[in-house]
């Protein structure tokens, strides 16, 4: 096996369409997100990724469980992670609406993705507080018929193009005062600014400023639930599901780097040994992440927390890309663009769905409880 791209793994997951690479290149050139992605043959499948089964209108490329989603994310990461970050679909918001929304709210939200390609966003992270949701400063003040939202959000994926989404804001002090709302990101009361990036070219992350945005009472999610069930239930369901998938994206980037390196270089015996070690580490990380996803699907105790799965995958991916760059022969000319691209892109995953520092702290706090469960 000369190229990691030819591994049997490549044939197992959903095909992304023969046009995936072309679409990724157009997106990296900062083409209009909606216009470029609308041309992708696989976009309709991603547009329904995460929809509850009763809202899915096509059986084509349905991803029904977390393990299948993990495999799909790795495949997308191999082509370009920017495709996933820029894709249409309910994305992270799907978990919140499915968990907290009443029937009318779910029909209104998920129905948008049945009609046409639709982009969504998940507005939680703030400039001063980061993803420390318990310290949210964005406020939702009750008024006649609804709420007025003021504050700001940062690093909001698809924030420039989203037509719908979920917004987290504080209606009262304390942990129980945090609530989730359906909102329209295109409302004129929201000022949006696209953020400059050094990696993931084509991805649109936005800073969003809310100036007394009116949200009707009917858009408050979880009104039929106890306050103790609202925020924690929606946030943890989202993060636990998607953190391993972020790790899979990183592994996809690393696998592409391995493929590109071997395309350019005929390895010496020493380099072949290095490649063999890197591939073994890749397969180990990929298998461990897939195992946790399968355990989640089967409602079994997990061998690792979702946060640590993501952390382990990202660390391995970073190390693979870095070692490949250092091992690239100097006499082969400039480093290939694809390797520099992988180097920039893989750094982004550290800051996606929580840094490794946060996940390690979380693991240390929860480890005794996890150990007792397995005894």
Question: Can you describe what each PLM-predicted range is?
Answer:
Residues 81-104:
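N-terminal glycine-rich flavin-associated loop
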Residues 2-4, 9, 328-375:
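Glycine-rich phosphate/cofactor-binding loops in nucleotide/flavin-utilizing enzymes
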Residues 1-88, 367-375:
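Amphipathic, small/basic residue-rich leader segments at the start of a protein or domain
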Residues 25-36, 262-270, 282-336:
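C-terminal helix-coil-helix/basic helical segment that borders enzyme active sites and/or dimer interfaces
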Residues 115-125:
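A short, Trp-centered hydrophobic/proline-enriched beta-strand micro-motif
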């Amino acid at each position: 096996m000369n190229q990691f791209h030819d591994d049997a793994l490549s044939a197992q997951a959903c095909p992304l369409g023969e046009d995936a690479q072309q679409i990724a290149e157009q997106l990296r050139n900062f083409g209009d997100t909606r216009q470029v992605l609308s041309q992708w043959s696989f976009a309709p499948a991603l547009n329904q990724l995460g929809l509850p089964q009763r809202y899915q209108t096509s059986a084509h490329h349905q991803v029904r469980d977390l393990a299948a989603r993990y495999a799909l994310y790795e495949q997308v990461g191999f082509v370009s992670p920017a495709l996933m970050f820029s894709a249409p679909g309910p994305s992270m918001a799907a978990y919140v609406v499915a968990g907290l929304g009443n029937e009318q709210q779910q029909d209104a939200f998920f129905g948008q993705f049945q009609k046409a390609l639709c982009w969504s966003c998940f507005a939680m992270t703030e400039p001063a507080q980061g993803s420390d949701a318990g310290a949210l400063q964005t406020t939702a003040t009750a008024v006649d018929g609804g709420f007025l939202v003021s504050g700001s959000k940062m690093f909001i994926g698809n924030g420039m193009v989203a037509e719908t989404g979920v917004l987290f804001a504080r209606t009262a002090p304390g942990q129980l005062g945090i609530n989730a709302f359906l909102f329209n990101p295109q409302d004129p009361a929201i000022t949006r600014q696209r953020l400059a990036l050094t990696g993931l070219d084509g991805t649109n992350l936005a800073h969003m400023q809310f100036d007394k945005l009116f949200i009707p009472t009917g858009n408050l999610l979880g009104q039929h639930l106890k306050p103790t069930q609202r925020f924690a239930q929606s946030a943890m369901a989202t993060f636990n599901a998607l953190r391993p998938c972020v790790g899979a994206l990183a592994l996809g980037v690393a696998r592409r780097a391995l493929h590109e390196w071997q395309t350019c270089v005929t390895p010496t015996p020493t380099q072949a040994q290095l490649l063999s070690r890197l591939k073994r580490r890749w397969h180990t990380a990929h298998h461990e992440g897939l195992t946790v996803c399968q355990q989640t699907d089967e409602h079994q105790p997990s061998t690792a927390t979702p946060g640590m799965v993501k952390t382990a995958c990202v660390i391995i991916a970073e190390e693979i890309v870095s070692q490949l760059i250092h091992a690239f022969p100097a006499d082969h000319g400039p480093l290939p663009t694809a390797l520099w691209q992988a180097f920039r892109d893989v750094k982004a995953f550290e800051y996606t769905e929580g840094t490794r520092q946060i996940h390690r702290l979380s693991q240390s706090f929860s480890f005794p409880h996890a150990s007792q469960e397995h005894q």
